[in-house]
Amino acid sequence: MVYLVTGQPDLFENPNYKLMSVEESLQLLSSCKILQYDSETTGVDARICDLLCVQFGNKEKDFQIVVDTTTVSILLYKSILEDKYIVGQNLKFDLQFLYNYGIIPRKVYDTMIVEQLLYLGYPSGTISYSLASIAQRRLGIDIDKSIRGQIIWRGLDEQVILYSANDVRWLEDIMHSQLKDCEEKQCKVGAKLECDFVPVISYLEWCGIKLDEEKWLVKMKKDKENLDKARESLDKFITSNPNLSQFTHIERQGDLFSGFNSDPICTINWSSSRQVVQLAKILGFDTTVQDKKTKEDKDSVLEKHLKTQKGINDEFLDLYFAYQEYAKVVSSFGQSQLNMINPKTGRCHTIYKQLGAASGRMSCGSQQPNHALAKLKGIPAKDCTYCNFQQLPSDEVTRSCFVAEEGNLFCSCDYSALESRLGADIYQEHSMIEEFLYKSGDIHSLVAKACFPELKDKTTEEIKKNYPHLRKKAKPIGFSQQFGGSARAIASSLGCSLEEAEDIAAAYLNGFPGIAKFKADGSKAVRQKGYVLMCKYTGHKMYWWDHQVWLDRQKSFTQEFWEEYRTRHKDTGDAIALSVREHFQAASKWDRMALNSPTQGTGIVILKSAMTDFFNYIVDNGLFNRVKIVALVHDEANIEYPINLSMDVVLKECMEKAAAKFCKSLPIPAEAAVGDHWIH
């Protein structure tokens, strides 16, 4: 049965639903343990737009209640929303509109988030997580969403009321279906952790972060100057090299007023990769890479490709990389940040995706326009998008532009050597655990000791003091090996021969038997099971989505197959050769995932657990909207709070306690920095 609660009953009489008073609705809702919840709004930005209606449903009692919040105060339902167990779809969105009224639900189940958890690892676009798609996939039910885009301009009418009610009809059924899968896949603990984090990430977006506009304008001017200087240096590199005259032009014409200039002028547009490719080839660089999607060769001058060719023309690489860096800063972190400032809050509000990567890590930002904010500020919608704070330059000048409000402090708190410490625990690499627990904690020196025979009998303290050059070499080795890198990657980073790099890689695994065992076991497990267990405590898994295809292909590799392959493999366009290449590339990729995903996956579980505890402290102590969570970047938490509170101590304690729950062999300390701006 569909009910409508409204302050204007005379306008909404209809045989398709029944009118109900506020008191009657509260009585019915109070009798339920679980409530399905959704809301319709006047727009997508909770800090600008408002509620149009909210919907409650319950499967056992078979009702849906639509509350017209334009005539009935949502505050009348505060205790219901905060006390009952709420099931919803993409609740991060709905909660922000409730936060505007000081309503803070924390007992929530999000069908979208749990569905994403159950399909972690599937490529973007292969699975839809909309309510309609989930209902069709799990229940075989078609949910009509044709009115969704019309609600903003239609307002509340008969069709919108019935549409809204239908959105809270099937959520419990979806939840029960998902929980069966969670039980089977042993990830119910992970599902609860992710659902508990939904109110936190919603609060993170709702709080936003304050940007000092004057400081930012000064930074923008300096960035533009740096970009101009980088462009001039590249132009000079061309014009001063006679062998590159094809990329110059001499202006023969002039006049008596401006004079005559016979100096060569660079004709390359440094923002055009096509033009830079032509230059790079002439300078001797190999610009050919394989397109990941089409598997066809293409030209590239991306830094990650060119930096592997050091020694060909390092002067050009240094100049070009500097230009690319400044160009990215100017285009991505300039006026767009100022456009993000919400006039109503005076703060920048962005979008976070809770399960933004296959590892379970969050992602940040979106090129989707904020139409409500653009309209409010009177700027084109295309110029009003959401900033990616995870890619924000970490230099002091940039970070110092993000500040605390007057009377507040800004605290940045991050984990010390999170992935190294966590890796030591997960791999059960005893030499690393002992280094952290009883010695200097210098993992780079420990890696150097394992990889370079001349350091075999040296202590890590001696290596750091007397062999800094080898310790420096050990840094990229350790990083590469912990993340499943090949000997070729070591050779590229150190500039050594492949044979020498292979010896170093072998020495690394010999020196760290725990990592070697974990690597071998992980490779075997992922090939057999088709997933990587990223956190053994929560059951978070990364699924090899086309694992069955890989297994079927593996079975087809018979003796007859290999005999045919040997006669045709040199033909790179041959279907058999391509199939073999793809097969072993997939195996190599998942071997790497099996090694490095557990540290990344458990790392983000730790941060989510910590911030959930911190958010609960905020709410339990009446500090909602006084203590703000303003940014989460990888393993770093940033908060803002009144100067008379010691929230840095609370945050540090929450982070260290969370780490202790998931890292049993050694502590992971958190380090807090407090000031009037973003310090880290």
Regions found by a protein language model. Give the residues of each.
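Active-site-proximal helix-loop-helix substrate-binding element of RNase H-like nuclease domains
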Residues: V2-Y17, D45, C49-E183, L193, ...
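Glycine- and acidic
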Residues: W153-V160, I209-L217, F260-S262, C401-S412, ...
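Conserved catalytic core of nucleic-acid polymerases
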Residues: W206, T345, H349-T350, L355-A357, ...
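Short, contiguous acidic/charged loop-to-helix segments that flank catalytic cores in large enzymes
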Residues: T294, Q337-P343, L355-G356, Q368, ...
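A common structural junction motif
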Residues: G511-F512, E653-C663
